[in-house]
């Protein structure tokens, strides 16, 4: 199984993102934001930030390629059961920030996914949840 860092829009179908449908490819690839994929299996979008965002607007403001405090997982999806968890397990060892936190929608599915995969809820916000993963 090969993990890739996306460098071209042809490598990922962002229209398949069930959570962040309106987020353009350019946004996902600028200011410290990246996309990782296990081709045809799973995708995760990350952002490096100096502060913990609780909204997508804050994520946009706080994203910075020089940030070393947080890696934010703001969307993850898979095409087959189990690959969402697998891509997180592949990506975490590659990251070099102090903390690994999600910006998750307020859904039961997000709670189940992240808690089953070892994350701890650290913040219940007006528009989102933040779960923290540990290496």
Protein language model annotation of sequence segments:
Residues 1-27:
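Short amphipathic alpha-helix that is part of the acyltransferase structural core
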Residues 24-42, 48-52:
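A short helix-loop-beta-strand connector motif used in the catalytic cores of GNAT acetyltransferases and
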Residues 33, 68, 96-97:
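Short, high-confidence coil segments that cap the C-terminus of an alpha-helix
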Residues 41-71:
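Conserved acyl-donor/pantetheine-binding loop and adjacent beta-alpha core of acyl/acetyltransferases
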Residues 78-94, 116:
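Conserved acetyl-CoA-binding loop-helix of GNAT-fold acetyltransferases
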Residues 95-106:
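Conserved GNAT acetyl-CoA-binding A-motif
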Residues 105-128:
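Conserved active-site alpha-helix within GNAT-family acetyltransferase domains
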């Amino acid at each position: 199984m090969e993990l890739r860092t996306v460098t071209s829009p042809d490598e990922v179908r962002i229209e398949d993102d069930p959570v962040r449908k309106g987020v353009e490819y350019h946004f996902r690839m600028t200011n410290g934001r990246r996309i990782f994929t296990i081709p045809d299996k799973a995708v995760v979008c990350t952002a490096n930030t100096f502060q913990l965002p609780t909204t997508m607007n804050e994520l946009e403001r706080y994203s910075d390629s020089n940030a070393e405090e947080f890696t934010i997982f703001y969307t993850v999806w898979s095409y087959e059961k189990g690959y969402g968890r697998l891509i997180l397990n592949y990506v975490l060892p590659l990251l070099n920030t102090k903390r690994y936190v999600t910006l998750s929608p307020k859904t039961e599915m997000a709670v189940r996914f992240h808690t089953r995969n070892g994350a701890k809820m650290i913040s219940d916000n007006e528009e989102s949840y933040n779960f923290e993963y540990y290496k």
